[in-house]
Amino acid sequence: MKRKFSLLLAMIATLAVNAQNPQKGDYGYLYCHMSDKGQWTAYAVSRDGYHYEDILGGGPIMDPKEHARIEGGQRDAFICRSWDGKGYVMVTTDMNNSMTKALGKQSEWDNYGIDLLKSDDLIHWTSVSFDYRKGTEIFSNPNDKSVYKEWSTINRVWAPQIFWDPD
């Protein structure tokens, strides 16, 4: 894993050194997505927003089993800067449809949670998984009256897009 992160850092450094930036300051686009090679989050980079190249050959930027604690797969990744601009927040759907039988799911598209991740450097992540089958205990105030009666019936949870609104 250290080798992958070293390679990622080397690739990013190479891009920064070789780029002939016509603008002052940093620019470019980072796209986080589910890799077509597996059910994990991968990065791709672009200078123009149209042409992207996978980093690490589309390999995982983190261990999905460490951060997707419900099913061990990550889909629908969305990333943004943290509210203070000093880090990053990512949300992913915790789903691995190749585990349908092993997990006893009725459908390969059933899933039960989302993962919220935080990083200071886009490489090292901490995370928490929200398993909706556990009901209100996953929320910040589990004693509030629930508007939903039967949490165990929830079987299609998808990661939302996220943003910070300072107002």
Residue spans of the language-model regions?
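Intrinsically disordered, low-complexity sequence elements enriched in Ser/Thr/Gly/Pro
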Residues: 1-2, 73
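Sec-dependent signal peptide recognition
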Residues: 2-9
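Hydrophobic h-region of N-terminal signal peptides that target proteins for export
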Residues: 10-18
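Carbohydrate-active catalytic/glycan-binding domains of CAZyme proteins
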Residues: 19-167
